[in-house]
Amino acid sequence: MSSDYQHIRFQVEDRVARITFARPPLNVFNIAMMREITAALSESARREIVAIVLAADKDCRAFSAGVAIEEHVQDTIYQMLDSFHAIFRQLEQIAKPVIALVDGAALGGGCEIVAACDVVIASDRSRFGVPEIKLGVFPPVATILLPLVIGEKRARELILTGEIIDAVEAGRLGLCNHVVPGPQLEPKLLEVTAKLRELSGTSLEFARRAMDLGRGRTLDEALSEQENIYLHELMKTADANEGIKAFMEKRKPVWRNR
């Protein structure tokens, strides 16, 4: 186990790496935490493993409630987006199967990480959504991945309305592979990882890379396009800045539609 992290825990056991989000109560991603997740993924790439598990610490009430709103302001927006998207670029680069173990809310950036995982095991109390539009912004990763995972029309509806869905609906849409009672999360995880341990880690990497290539363009290319819109167009609008400011001031935003 590595002890060099403050907001996560990292361990490798029986050819499976586990990255545990440990920033209670809601695992809100700040820049430091996101960089730690990327570092742990990079460390996983150097290990002979068959899978990576992403999960929340038992003391946390959510898988993740998303990226810290206070880091969406002009002073930190570039660092924030770069640090968050580095997670997804690293996931694509290492090409190892990734399993999300979700118990509680996976919202905003938390839901985007779920969408990027190969297998999602969720408790029946879990909730999912990308409510960024209510703050006057949009979720760049979700605009790329959600249509691929759950279909174009439903993805558009979730992104454009900010709707939160329960685990049953997430399972029906294909965002979750397995929805189980909370006590069955770890047993279901053991069942899935047992299947992967019987396989070649190298072959799993090639299979995952082949599926990524089948999308027609890399996630890195798609993210670069979204970053340009987000940073150089959206974040220069009055409404994007008003939405973030209103959230931090705990009031309703006053939209100017510009």
Language model features with spans:
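Crotonase-fold acyl-CoA enzyme core
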Residues: 2-4, 92-202, 237, 242, ...
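C-terminal alpha-helix plus adjacent terminal tail
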Residues: 1-14, 23, 44-47, 57-60, ...
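A short acidic, glycine-rich active-site loop
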Residues: 73-83
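Hydrophobic alpha-helical segments typical of transmembrane helices
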Residues: 83, 87, 141-145, 154, ...
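Hydrophobic/aromatic residues within transmembrane alpha-helices
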Residues: 19, 54, 68, 113-115, ...
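Short strand->helix junction
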Residues: 26-27, 62, 136, 178, ...
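A structural preference for short, pocket-lining loop segments at secondary-structure junctions
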Residues: 14-22, 32-75, 90-101, 119, ...
